[in-house]
Amino acid sequence: MTRVPRGYIARRRRTKMRSFASNFRGAHLRLNRMITQQVRRAFVSSHRDRGRQKRDFRRLWITRINAATRVYNVFNSYSKLIHNLSKKELILNRKMLAQVAVLNPNNLYTISNKIRTIN
């Protein structure tokens, strides 16, 4: 069987994969088969973790809001705060509430007073 010399297309594909693997170490940086496997695995992980990151941040914000509401006696729990916010139709997302709870807890009191006074 005759040997088929690969053209520039295969070389271009490998150099593209190498550019993705530029920060890897050892055989993962040097061997083409290992490079393709590790780059594919890295892409799978990054795709999975983009969705996971959204869940993790939401959990972090909820934890921060819950801790602040209990420490500063704004409400008894996070769920009561969110329930009253939605009932009074105040539109504050969890990210904003967490920032307020961490950086300026006094504003959390003003938000809770708004919830209690609006009828």
Swiss-Prot record:
Keywords on record: Chloroplast, Plastid, Ribonucleoprotein, Ribosomal protein, RNA-binding, rRNA-binding
SUPFAM superfamilies: Ribosomal protein L20 (SSF74731)
GO annotation terms (biological process): ribosomal large subunit assembly; translation
Location(s), subcellular: Plastid, Chloroplast
Keyword Cytoplasm assigned: no
Molecular function per GO: rRNA binding; structural constituent of ribosome
Matching Pfam families: Ribosomal_L20
Predominant location category: plastid
Cellular-component GO terms for this entry: chloroplast; ribonucleoprotein complex; ribosome
Role noted for this protein: Binds directly to 23S ribosomal RNA and is necessary for the in vitro assembly process of the 50S ribosomal subunit. It is not involved in the protein synthesizing functions of that subunit.
Family affiliation: Belongs to the bacterial ribosomal protein bL20 family.
Protein name: Large ribosomal subunit protein bL20c
Organism: Saccharum hybrid
Biological classification of the source: Eukaryota, Viridiplantae, Streptophyta, Embryophyta, Tracheophyta
